Design a protein with these regions (language model features):
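Bacterial N-terminal signal peptides
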Residues: 8-20
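Cap/lid segment of the alpha/beta-hydrolase catalytic domain
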Residues: 403-519, 526
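Active-site-proximal cap/loop segments of hydrolase catalytic domains
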Residues: 468, 474, 482-712
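Beta-strand C-termini and the immediately following turn/loop, strongest in propeller blades
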Residues: 51-58, 99-105, 110-117, 155-161, ...
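Structural motif
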Residues: 61-68, 118-123, 163-170, 220-224, ...
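Predominantly five- to eight-bladed beta-propeller fold
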Residues: 65-69, 159-238, 399-405, 462-468
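Non-catalytic accessory segments flanking enzyme active sites
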Residues: 221-222, 349-441, 466-470, 474-475, ...
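Multi-bladed beta-propeller domains
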Residues: 24-37, 71-97, 125-143, 226-263, ...
Length: 712
């Protein structure tokens, strides 16, 4: 082949690649679902390597793959995969548990919990990637691990055996499951959800609001000590514990706080055993150090950064009297890394990031950077930049990219996010991440989608990852993630009103700039974000389409959950002002969509977890018999978040279709979706006819021509 012909072939390939990249205005929902997450960082004792875990969903396999990697801190070599075939262990609401591995003192091995073959055991992997092997073979799932200071012994905790749990579940089922306050009603009573990789019974715990765990999770735990050389085990004795002092739970600091879904906000120094912790008051947080955790004498961090910012993580510098911590400034959307020297009291700003330092998303509060003597390794991410590893030099603040796993997402980034601030009529400050619509013409106003809740980290789909913000923007629908303001102390209704005010002010701001069409605004969310969207839907005419992932409060919800007793009822009264429907009828009429069917006239898509959807019966059924367009999808065995990759993709794809249909009049020509659009067109025709008959404007303004959506 001549050189000229080779050049022509290469040019053709380059043009095809360029065309493909141009056609892909933004990441697809599938690409967002399959984002690679990084977590659980730990630096080796010799300070030369960092170990971390990489998690990724696979839609094809409908599973998550977790692998452990080790990489030199100097970046001289790419990371080496030292262990794979691991399934993520999940916690409350379906969140993935993160925990740094334990390095052996000689820096040759990492020890970690792994779920393999339906069992959670301790495994270890050689740092050079030569082998990975199972360490424990316990009949029960391992819940926590500790490595002795000399690396010769392993300590781990377990509850009842897997066989005991499964036998107890089956025995209860065989004789009939007695309904007690800790049995969740409204879902299957026998093995409704996934616990440690299998369908299992669940019960309410007394640890938090609506928190569930496995059937025998409240049984006493046992601590086992394993001799790594001989394999011999015994129940831990008091004289064994000093060898594991660095990794054992910290007792005696009742003022400390553990954030939901994250690591403990109590960390022990390897230098002298001092403990850094966060003391939370009614409206402030303070970083403190206890030289002796058994006494009430504390050293408070004197700098404003220790009090004004939202503290996200803590770590000690090796062999130094310094605490490295991360603080978030909501008004600027930035997080900063600081060094507090306890002896001198000085606090130094190391670096600042327009996103998250120490994690790829905002769910995992407390996931810290891995700290070496002179530098830290952190997972960095921002609204439009997916998770990656960077090193940060403590002396200079200089940062260097260590590992970029999400190259495909980087190549298909699409519209860049813009950080916005605005105030409502009450002067309250709001912040958000705005993705401008792609493909618009000058002077053309785009439709707008709004998600209201948490906007930390890489925004693949808002909290819950179900609304593909970048994909919507790439399709011509501007997207705005609004960071929810702190909960109003007077209760949830005040917080909903704040959300309504902030959403309205944001729409007015973007409309005044000629960027969006205020008559074509959609909104969606999970949990509080879902409640906010339904409140805006009921209390305003701002929205043209809605999609929610969590039901809100209804009489059915109250009836099924009130069996939990006084604690549930007290919290409902405190936060929402709700007693039973007969005790507080006016509050229910104001709050619940079940009593506001006439105000639910906006097309609404419901995509709920099976464990929660029952609460929507009170308003889904009446809506189904009305002219309001509504569809309800239920994802089997899901808790609060959608866990299965195929469920995540289905929710994302359907949300994209839903908002393109109602905000752009767009119908995907994919023949496999023909039946979906036939239903939606039928619902739309009925809805428009009913609105015309009622003397309303039955169609949203389309004078701006579909918001500049690129047409295939």
């Amino acid at each position: 082949m001549s050189n000229r012909l080779i050049h022509l072939v290469l040019l053709a390939h380059c043009l095809m690649l360029l065309s493909s990249l141009q056609a892909r205005a933004a990441p697809s929902p599938k690409m967002l679902v399959e984002t690679i997450d990084l977590s659980s960082l730990a630096i080796s004792p010799d300070g030369l390597n960092v170990a971390f875990r990489q998690d990724q969903a696979s839609v094809e396999r409908n599973a998550f793959a977790a692998g452990w990697y080790v990489q030199p801190l100097d970046g001289a070599h790419p990371p080496v995969r030292v262990a794979d075939g691991v399934e993520p262990v999940r916690m409350i609401y379906g969140l993935v548990a993160t925990a740094p591995p334990k390095w052996s003192p000689d820096s040759r091995w990492i020890y970690y919990r792994a779920m393999v073959g339906g069992e959670i055991q301790v495994w270890r992997a050689a740092a050079d990637g030569s082998r990975a092997e199972q360490v424990t073979h316990d009949a029960a799932d391992v819940e926590s691990i500790a490595l002795s200071l000399d690396g010769r012994q392993l300590s781990y905790t377990v509850g009842p055996s897997r066989e005991t749990i499964e036998r107890s579940e089956q025995e209860e089922a065989d004789r009939g499951i007695r309904i007690t306050p800790n049995v969740p009603l409204g879902e299957e009573v026998f093995r409704p959800g996934v616990v440690n990789g299998r369908l299992a019974d669940e019960r309410y715990t007394d640890k938090g609001w609506m928190e569930q765990a496995g059937l025998l999770a409240g049984q006493p735990k046992r601590r086992i000590v394993l001799d790594l050389a001989s394999g011999a085990t015994h129940e831990a004795r008091p004289e064994d514990l000093p060898a594991f002092s660095q990794d054992l739970p910290i007792e005696g600091l009742k003022a400390s706080s553990t954030p939901a879904g994250g690591n403990d906000f109590r960390v022990r120094s390897g230098l002298d055993g001092s403990v850094a912790f966060v003391e939370r008051g009614a409206s402030t947080s303070t970083l403190r150090v206890a030289r002796d955790p058994t006494k009430s004498s504390f050293i408070a961090c004197p700098a404003a950064a220790c009090k004004d910012a939202v503290l996200r993580s803590l770590a000690w510098r090796p062999d130094r009297d310094d605490v490295v911590f991360t603080g978030a400034d909501r008004s600027s959307g930035r997080q900063s890394l600081y060094d507090w020297n306890i002896t001198s009291g000085s606090v130094k700003l190391i670096t600042s990031e327009a996103g998250v330092i120490g994690g790829g998303r905002g769910l995992m509060t407390g996931e810290s950077c891995a700290v070496a003597a002179q530098s830290a390794v952190c997972v960095m991410a921002s609204a439009d930049v997916p998770p990656h590893l960077e090193t940060v030099d403590f002396a200079t603040g200089q940062r260097h990219l260590l590992y970029e796993p999400n190259t495909t997402l980087i190549a298909a980034r699409g519209p860049r996010a813009q950080f916005l601030t605005w105030t409502d009529d009450h002067g309250r400050l709001f912040t958000g991440q705005y993705f401008p619509a792609a493909g618009g013409k000058p002077g053309q106003r785009a439709p707008l989608f709004i998600n209201y809740y948490s906007c930390d980290g890489y925004l693949r789909g808002g909290l819950g990852d179900e609304w593909p913000l970048a994909s919507l923007a790439g399709a011509g629908i501007a997207s705005l993630c609004i960071q929810a303001r702190p909960n109003d102390p007077s209760g949830q209704i005040a917080s909903y009103e704040t959300a309504l005010s902030g959403v309205g002010a944001a729409v007015d701001l973007l409309a005044s700039r000629g960027l969006v069409d205020p008559s074509r605004v959609g909104m969606g969310g999970l949990s509080f974000g879902s409640e906010a969207a339904q409140w805006v839907m009921m209390r305003s005419n701002r929205l043209a389409a809605v999609s929610v992932a969590t039901p809100t409060l209804t009489p059915t919800y109250y009836l099924t959950q009130s069996l939990q007793g006084a604690g549930f009822k007290a919290n409902l009264l405190k936060e929402w002002g709700l007693g039973s429907p007969s005790e507080t009828p006016e509050a229910w009429k104001r709050l619940s969509p079940a009593f506001n069917i006439d105000k639910l006239q906006t097309p609404i898509l419901m995509q709920f977890a099976e464990q929660e959807y029952f609460a929507a019966w009170d308003y889904f059924v009446p809506l189904s018999e009305s002219s309001t367009p509504v569809e309800l999808y239920v994802f089997p065995h899901e808790p609060h978040l959608q866990i299965e990759p195929r469920h995540q993709l289905a929710a994302n794809d359907r949300n994209l279709d839903w908002f393109r249909f109602w905000l752009q009049d767009y119908v995907d020509p994919d023949p496999e979706k023909a039946e979906q659009y036939h239903r939606w067109e039928t619902m739309k025709a009925r809805w428009v006819a009913a609105r015309h008959q009622a003397g309303q404007d039955g169609s949203r303004s389309r004078e701006h021509g579909g918001g500049g959506a690129p047409q295939p």
